[in-house]
Amino acid sequence: MTRTVHVIGGGLAGSEAAWQLAQADIPVILHEMRPVRTTPAHQTDGLAELVCSNSLRSDDADYNAVGLLHEEMRRAGSLILAQADAHKVPAGGALAVDRDGFSQGVQAALAGHPRITILREEVAGLPPEDWEQVVIATGPLTSPAMAEALRGMTGEDSLAFFDAIAPIVTKDSIDFGKAWFQSRYDKGTGSDYINCPLDREQYNTFIDALITGEKVDFHEWEKDTPYFEGCLPIEVMAERGKDTLAYGPMKPVGLTNPNGPKPFAVVQLRQDNALGTLYNLVGFQTKLRHGEQARIFRAIPGLENAEFARLGGLHRNTFINGPRVLDRTLRLKAQPRLRLAGQVTGCEGYVESSAIGLLAGLFAAAEALGRDMLRPPATTALGALLNHVTGDAEAETYQPMNINFGLFPPPPERDERGRRVKGRDRKKLYAQRAREALTPWLNTIRE
């Protein structure tokens, strides 16, 4: 009889790991602490809740590493990607989802699987000794008891960084006499984003307000915690230089204002639900106090009467030093019955977290069945990400990382004709090589 595998955490990684195990006919108990114990950032008790953005980023599998990871996960039977595709909303070349529909779809699939049992309870601390195989996917908002247990097992201090959340506004509160629909360079449908224009004077006033606005205070023990560079609060970016945002998330390139002159800067809003009634401010994650957010963001042309469905916020993320404490199949070296998955391993992003959950589920299933399982090739997105988390990164300076082509072994610099391959052609070469390597690996795990 196959032993039950316990998965702790019903976020993206835990949900994906549980699905992969169940699809391999392994009995799974999925433990989710919400609603028994809540977190500072979650709004619901749904499985696979998207806490920050509703975007899974670029879906371009030829020229973007995260788009390639999407493709590989689809080919590997990912539940998260299947539900993202089922609940996607317009977002240009990105894969964005209706967050409620997505979460409900994941939860329904897991609850309806005959090999999965969902328990709403907190696993406080070290899992019981008679749990022979455990996947810990407690996420960036790991409870204090579990964080302390991990610290004790690894012999290391918990590492942490701050992550911020962007506000969401109702579409019908936006003034379309000033704002307009358009994607940069008319990608996607050509009108997947709402754009709010600012001239130079308005932009300068906005930047000054961001810098001087009242921020959330840190606890004493949080003050030395760094931010994740890929999700900086907008006011932190503003403090780095007056025009930092004008060359970053507020750059006006690829857009034409039908309501007036060419803007100096643009605030973009991306659809947040399937109904198209909610839009989030792209790149506007913030630690401003709620009253300040309403005041400052309503100074943006087109958002003067904005109704906020959710204001931004800040939460502290916890992760372990994967290269130091994990083996090559995501097991804790100190306790091999425990396998880690998701953002707690130090990968960063929804897609990356789900991908590590997928691999943890596959590794755990193979172990439960007494089979050896090959790791995905290093030339694939799955393999490159796994290698980063489990050993290729420098342990002394290990930090959360999104998937990128810099994690892959470099392809040949010249093609078969001896011509140097660079730019977009080089990115496509990464993707072609990954596809070729993934097929035989998928065949081995399906045998």
Curated annotation (Swiss-Prot):
Transmembrane segments: none annotated. Its cofactor is FAD. One of its GO terms (biological process) is tRNA methylation. It holds the Pfam family GIDA. Its EC number is 2.1.1.74. PANTHER family: GLUCOSE INHIBITED DIVISION PROTEIN A, METHYLENETETRAHYDROFOLATE--TRNA-(URACIL-5-)-METHYLTRANSFERASE TRMFO. This is Methylenetetrahydrofolate--tRNA-(uracil-5-)-methyltransferase TrmFO. It comes from Paramagnetospirillum magneticum (strain ATCC 700264 / AMB-1). The gene is trmFO.
